[in-house]
Amino acid sequence: MPSGIGLLNLRVVLFDSDIYALQALNSYLAWDRRTRVMFMTPNIHEFWEYLRITLAAELPDIVVLDADHLGGATGLRNTLRRIQDLSPHTGIVCMVQSLQEPELAQVAAEEGAKAFLLKNEVRLRIAWAICATVEHDMIVTSEVQRATHDISNRRLYNAFILPEQRDYPEMTDRIRQAIRLCVIEGMPAHLAADEMGISLHTIRGYIKEGYRILEANDHYEYPTDMTPQERAFMRFTALADER
């Protein structure tokens, strides 16, 4: 089975000042049985209050943290330390919109964060990245690795580079679009057909062919109660080396 399916059940808390990014993260994680979003907020005060009042047994396994808007390197360091004080066993995944401040990655590494990811790189792979933190000391995306190669930090130097999303060469752009709309975004077929300017019959054909391609390139067995749509989501978002 794919890494951790049936084994992992990670409690996740999301903080991102961008409400649209927050909703996207929640949506992608909701599709993956290995991750369970317990709380999300764009408000840092609500974030602290949640950690403060939550029972120790119910504290998150993972916090996904918008590291761009915390007051630079000093603000990030203070935030990471406070999270660790409130929830010592929680892994922290830092995400940034840009790499204009590579020193943020250094701070994340020094303070024990489990990942430092560029949002535009990780995209649909966020659940896979979170689950990979269980197996690796630290994870970065490839652009983060390039931007920090001259920073002297053992954890950054040895960090696991998140693989690219699995490629499906057989999948045409139109089939890929249909899969994205109906599987990733969860859009009903008739609305997706209207969005693409095609008939309902045609989009159903695209989805059927997309499912066939996804299954042909995947060798895992899945829990019997997983729907075809769940399997398709897992396969479409899988990492290149997860076969």
Where are these regions (language model features)?
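Glycine-rich, flexible loop segments associated with nucleotide phosphate handling
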Residues: 58-62, 76-79, 174, 195, ...
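N-terminal regulatory/sensing modules of transcriptional regulators
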Residues: 1-150
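Terminal C-lobe "cap" of eukaryotic-type protein kinase domains
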Residues: 151-156
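Basic, Lys/Arg-enriched C-terminal extension of HTH/homeodomain DNA-binding domains
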Residues: 208-243
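Short, structured secondary-structure boundary patches
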Residues: 135-142, 162-165, 207, 213, ...
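Short glycine/serine/threonine/alanine-rich loop segments
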Residues: 113, 198, 216
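Helix-turn-helix DNA-binding segment
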Residues: 158-204, 208
